[in-house]
């Protein structure tokens, strides 16, 4: 048995150490985009955290900016906001953005070569998040109850992040095609 496990320490591998260094110390266009996507996801999660607190009864009111149509309380308390799994939709959004956050931080700077499927999954997830944001914005507009300013922040963050994984996803696809062609 590994002695480090007996002392409550996690075993380390050269690969994990390389990823740690790569994420923290390296640069590159794909890593920069991943970092911006990470920031956008954290903004979306922070915004949805306030909505979740309201939807769970821990806040009595969600303040809105002085804008026409702003009605965060009404939108966040609507039956539509509890439709999926009968759970607050903001909490589900946080879970979704947390998975995007994980994909943004998994793997080193060159993961498009080492684990191309991860880069492709990240690109697809960002595009999916952007698509969901568009659908939710459309539904909020159709609902006629006004809009949730907190939810708009999350949607804007998702839309800004949506294209950030494309270049890495395309590079990963090229790597996979070259590998198949060599077989």
Segments (PLM) and residue ranges:
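Short amphipathic, positively biased membrane-proximal segments
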Residues: 1-183
């Amino acid at each position: 048995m590994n002695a480090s496990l007996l002392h409550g320490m996690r075993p380390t591998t050269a690969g994990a150490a390389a990823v740690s260094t790569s994420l923290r110390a390296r640069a590159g266009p794909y890593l920069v985009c991943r970092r911006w996507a990470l920031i956008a996801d954290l903004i979306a999660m922070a915004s949805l955290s306030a909505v979740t607190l309201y939807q769970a009864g821990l806040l009595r009111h969600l303040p809105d900016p002085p804008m026409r149509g702003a009605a965060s309380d009404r939108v966040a308390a609507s039956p539509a906001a509890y439709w999926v799994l009968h759970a607050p939709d903001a909490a589900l959004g946080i879970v979704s953005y947390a998975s995007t956050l994980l994909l943004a931080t998994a793997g080193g700077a060159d993961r498009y070569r080492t684990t191309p499927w991860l880069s492709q999954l990240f690109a697809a997830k960002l595009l999916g998040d952007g698509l969901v944001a568009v659908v939710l914005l459309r539904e909020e507009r159709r609902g006629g109850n006004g809009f949730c300013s907190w939810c708009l922040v999350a949607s804007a963050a998702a839309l800004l992040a949506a294209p950030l994984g494309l270049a890495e996803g395309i590079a990963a696809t090229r790597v996979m095609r070259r590998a198949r062609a060599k077989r």
